[in-house]
Amino acid sequence: SLYAPSAVVISKTQGASADAPAQRAVTLRCLPVGGDHPAPEKACAALREAGGDPAALPRYVEDTGRVCTREYRPVTVSVQGVWDGRRIDHAQTFSNSCELEKQTASVYAF
């Protein structure tokens, strides 16, 4: 292939620790698009737009005007694998699942 591989495992955990057992995890492959992520095309496009940096996703997500409550029910997500030939090991905690979806769009929507 002419392109460097991009394949990651994305997981979601209730709570503020990435060390807790994942409640759900999916695989995502880009070029060719696949894995068991429910919307791989959208997730690959979002990561591509963010330069493969999951921490940068909020800067690229379209503001839908969605309003979230201030409820604190932390959700921690992680992305591990290879993006465009570079190793990724990212974890981030959001104050609740609404904030997670609002700030990251389709990548963690599973």
UniProtKB/Swiss-Prot annotation:
One of its GO terms (molecular function) is serine-type endopeptidase inhibitor activity. Its main location: secreted. Pfam families: SSI. Coiled coil: none annotated. Keywords: Disulfide bond, Protease inhibitor, Secreted, Serine protease inhibitor. Transmembrane segments: none annotated. PROSITE patterns: SSI. Disulfide bonds join C30-C44, C68-C98. The record marks R70, E71 as: Reactive bond. Signal peptide: none annotated. GO terms for cellular component: extracellular region. It is found in: Secreted. Strong inhibitor of subtilisin BPN'. Belongs to the protease inhibitor I16 (SSI) family. Homodimer. This is Subtilisin inhibitor-like protein 1. It comes from Streptomyces cacaoi. The lineage of its organism: Bacteria, Bacillati, Actinomycetota, Actinomycetes, Kitasatosporales.
